Amino acid sequence: MNESHEAGKNSSTNVEEREEEVLRLARQFTEQSSYSTAGQTPFAAEAGSALDPNGERFNARAWCKAMLQMHIGDKEAHPLRTLGVAFSNLNVHGFGSDTDYQKSVGNVWLKTLSLARIAFGQKQRKVDILQNLEGLVEAGEMLVVLGPPGSGCSTFLKTIAGETYGFHVDKNSNINFQGIAKQMAHEFRGEAIYTAEVDVHFPKLTVGDTLYFAARARTPRHIPGGVNATQYAGHMRDVIMAMFGISHTKNTIVGNDFIRGVSGGERKRVSIAEACLSNAPLQCWDNSTRGLDSANAIEFCKTLRMQADINGTTACVSLYQAPQAAYDYFDKVLVLYEGREIYFGPTSMAKHYFLQMGFVCPDRQTDADFLTSMTSHLERVVQPGYEDRVPRTPDEFAARWKASPQRAQLMQHIKSYNAKFALDGEYLDKFKQSRRAQQAKAQRVSSPYTLSYVQQVKLCLWRGYQRLKADPSVTISSLFGNTIISLVIASIFYNLKADTSTFFQRGALLFFAVLMNALGCGLEMLTLYAQRGIIEKHSRYALYHPSAEAFSSMIMDLPYKILNAITSNIVLYFMTNLRREPGAFFFFVFTSFILTLTMSMFFRSMASLSRSLVQVLPFSAVLLLGLSMYTGFAIPTGYMLGWARWIAYINPISYGFESLMINEFHNRDFPCMDYVPSGPGYTDVGLNNRVCSTVRSVPGQAFVNGNAYIESAYSYTASHKWRNIGVIFAYMFLLGAVYLVATDFITEKKPKGEILVFPRGHKALKKGKSDEDLEGGGGRSATVEKIGSDGLAMIERQTAIFQWKDVCFDIKIGKENCRILDHVDGWVKPGILTALMGVSGAGKTTLLDVLATRTTMGIISGEMLVDGQPRDESFQRKTGYAQQQDLHLSTATVREALEFSALLRQSAHVPRQEKIDYVTEVIKLLDMTEYADAVIGVPGEGLNVEQRKRLTIGVELAARPQLLLFLDEPTSGLDSQTSWAILDLLDKLKKNGQAILCTIHQPSAMLFQRFDRLLFLQAGGRTVYFGEIGQNSQILIDYFVRNGAPPCPPDANPAEWMLDVIGAAPGSHTSINWFETWRRSPEYARVQEHLAELKHERRHQTNLFRTTSGQKREDKDSYREFAAPFWAQLYQVQVRVFQQIWRSPTYIYSKTALCVLSALFVGFSLFHTPNTIQGLQNQMFGIFMLLTLFGQLIQQIMPHFVAQRALYEVRDRPAKTYSWKAFLIANIVVELPWNSLMSVLMFLCWYYPIGLYRNAEPTDAVHLRGTQMWLMIWTFLLFSSTFAHFMIAAFDAAENAGNLGNLLFLLCLLFCGVLATPDQLPRFWIFMYRVSPFTYLVSGMLSVGISNTNVTCADNEYLRFDPVNGTCGEYMGSYMSNLGGYLADEMATANCSFCPIKETNVFLGRVSSSYSDIWRNFGLMWVFIVFNIFAACSLYWWVRVPRDKKPVAKAE
């Protein structure tokens, strides 16, 4: 900015005068606009005018002025408000250290002990992050915050915006938001916002819908211009998209790192646009230009400048690699050095402040880079003679600033500002009035939200519908799966007879129906965790309450739940011949539906009460087990142990089951189908001397009363039918309230400040810094200039030339073909550093993907040759590709990641030790020695951005690429010093003969000059220039000027100038078709000639070499797809996966908790169950309930596997590091030892409490049968883990695989012989009984558990009747000899008490189980395990392994 503008800024201390001046200028601009906008409003603009956001002539400044004028002219519109901030004595600290130790299964308890010590009063180490910051940013001003990573820039911005999680603001710090202080964090939360560096959006929502939602959420109560809220939000969306050049992405999904959507730069602009639509008067932007090209970075700053000038918005922005044009838009600058303030003041004076101190600014270095260089002793240049006079350490710089007259003047301004805007004064009242006028009438005055709660819910409902339309797969698969399950259950219990023979089957049917309806929404937990970060971001922006989104999702799910209740329950009810009465049917459907809603609230509240998925899974599994076991069927109420009976009282499912049982049995008499005694010799016995073989039967009656049956068997009372419905409703509302409240107040787990994490036993090397800060996690790294040539000695020298001609790439969007790359030509030679540049979305990353053969979709055409020969299948592993996203295994160390790449990607003939030594050289070369043994971690707890980028490049260098190195945005997100260090590294590699093709955004003039050649693309993937850059970019500049471009100013950055020339920068236009200009140029002709020469010469040389040298075995091996043989791949991958699991204690201990707690719960719920008839039934259900863990076990494995697979498919597979077979087998095998350990724990915690060992005592087989039971539990866990891999192998989402897995799991449970014995199954389903693995599992476990012992009936299980004559023994002798059973007293002459079962083997026979089949069952379980492994591999190969593409065709 010029000095007159700066002076105007600094003199404007009166906010009211400033606002009046802004309004006066707005009126003047509107009246005298040079654009044809007279008589137009922004909402009724002529098509193609400057106010039309969908037209080519749209002008953002003209639109803003017109919008402001319209707002001023509307008396009902809310008053405009602005917000500045003054801060002094600002100190921020955290607790901890700059390093930590990695938690593993073995040492996590040590961490627990340290936390316990802290809880009992042991003080933590205090770490200062920001120290004594002072500054003043008035309304309408822009502040740029400069400093390297780790200097405290992010912490400062978060503090100003009120986001202080993970650190503490000192209580003596003074922050004055123009007369407002404590209210900013709550009442005015959305008025000061922080926009993080990462982009978090719903990936399958379109860009247009994402931004419409944000605009609508901040729509004011009264809208000037006479349009409704929908039109206003739509117009604001179109305007903001036009401002940031993303109008063309309106109907494209946003995507993320794993779901293809808009480009990375476009996604960043979506994040910026979303934040702008919040209309916050104070905006904090944290490195928001990361991933943007320089033109869009400048346009971003220009837009902020426009908002500040016209609307009075205040912006605080941290920038890395800030172009000079972007820096010039700012009024003030804050320079931070390890948390100390070393300058705060006008941007125009900052450079001079350090120059007069004795430092030198190199030629063509931007002001921002010069200021940032002050924080690095390796970068700052001292004037000769000033070596002993300039400050060196952060404290010396801070002390020099404290003593400066500039600081004294700043403190005077802060004092005046605080006096003018006293806290809680009149400006606070004005601010409240303006905010209130904007809010909906139904909104609370103290609420930070604009819309009323009802409006928020409606808006979230709209978004929910858009998301459902975008991805209905989970809903459809759930509905389909539930309908199939209903059909299967109905067919199993098809047309039940209305007599006593179906009593158990009716109970089992209703039990399964209740569980199916109640537990079918368990996967909702996964969805809630996936979207939590997005919703919390929107809450910080004050767009809506998190509970409003939660409430809308409840409503959004209602149509599905209603449809599911109708389709599933109609099929189930009528096919099974449940009570054929209208009232009974509708009560059944109604009860099932409200149970579904209640349990949906249960799952949602569980998810909202916990902060991560791993926290909740084990406990939710035990709760689900409790809900299922204490429903009243598996363990009838009378058999529940006293200490656990309360579980049934707090279990909503038990109330539903009781009501459905009453609904089915109340006031019905069921004819008796089986009498005792009966058969030969008893045909003439009357009813008085025999009894129905059902509980609560009465001698002399040919039926059993339903009320009596459920009262005796289940202790159910008919009067509870509607009472239970009321209880269920109460639970529904209670759990719903818990869900909504917890959603608003409990946030997800966030990372701490960035710290380095080391494996226990490794120590961080001392770094020679005076102070460490939480944010840095390692401080500044030196440039690679200090590394000598010795580190380069082992770097692979390359000789091959890679060339491409007429490369095109087309994808299908809808029904239309879209061309992403259009006839691109070029080459990469050893020792040449080639830059690939273009506007965001021009296809740079796509071109790298195509050239590196990493695309998995679309149609590729053109010619790509290596030394004149087509690329072979070894091409991918012979090239290095450093991706823009720094994707690494979070649990590995830096050294392990590099060694893994070296061992598997270098030639198999290179000795192992040489590969390890090579990794050591790469570590030295990249200056990673001090953190070589640090854990990679996740952002926030592990390597910082710079360190991750170095590691990404290092992984590719460690592979020793034989052909060339691709780098996608290697300097993205890095500050200028680190970017310069990365270019130092590339320059060293180039000088050693490395061939490099590198995309780059926002290069400074000095950085741009370090490249040799440039491939420049415009939108549509069309070449604008390919050739040398030249000294001071002169060859490039001459080309454009010769073809009609205006001259490049001497002080301009050629990288920014050329974007303006071709009209790629937002707001810039050109009448020249630069693509056609290039195609007609002599430079293009020379490129074509050289490509033909290269093809002929290199092909001839290659063929000659192959003919004269012959083909050695090593040469043949070099053309293999993978460098390492399969067994070497498997070994290395297996070691890494074992390390990863060991270093994931939350995964292992949640698995342990799941198995141990569930086993204990089942075991002690059935503690020492007696061998009565119901006791045997309970023991059988004890096995059955243990098997229900299957669902939770596979749900735990699937998300873990999906994360590993995403990393493999995005990084390791395209690099041909190892094969998919090694990946899949290693992930399956790694579960084996842990499942073995879990089986032992589960066996001990379940087998002995139930008391099954007592059944082996009569035959003296306690140890044998105990071992057999453990083997069956072991195979169950192995089957579960392999089945999980089988399910997830083909699916992208764990939710879809979970739905299918639950469907198959339920089928296994249904057909295992517990709920319906083989004799009761329809003949059609017998094959399912035989193919269900649970058939053999239950049969084996049940026979081992209860065989070969006697049964003792409980008192209510005896059947009582009088003999015809004689004793009971004489009367029942014939019957007992044929059908078994025993009498309590054979000598009794009246009231015979008969027990139908004498031995447990009879009970086993009824469920087709026999102890003699135990080893057959064990063997068959292994058959199923092997089948799962084979099916997982087959499915993965069929669905997810890319097929070899046919030879490319010539593009049209």
Swiss-Prot record:
The keyword Transmembrane applies. Residues 110-363, 802-1044 form the ABC transporter domain. Disruption phenotype: Does not lead to growth defects or changes in developmental patterns and does not affect sensitivity to itraconazole, amphotericin B, voriconazole, posaconazole, ravuconazole, or echinocandins. One of its GO terms (cellular component) is membrane. It is a multi-pass membrane protein. Its main location: membrane. Residues 1-20 are annotated as: Disordered. It is found in: Membrane. GO terms for molecular function: ABC-type transporter activity; ATP binding; ATP hydrolysis activity. PANTHER family: ATP-BINDING CASSETTE TRANSPORTER. Belongs to the ABC transporter superfamily. ABCG family. PDR (TC 3.A.1.205) subfamily. This is ABC multidrug transporter A-1. The gene is abcA.
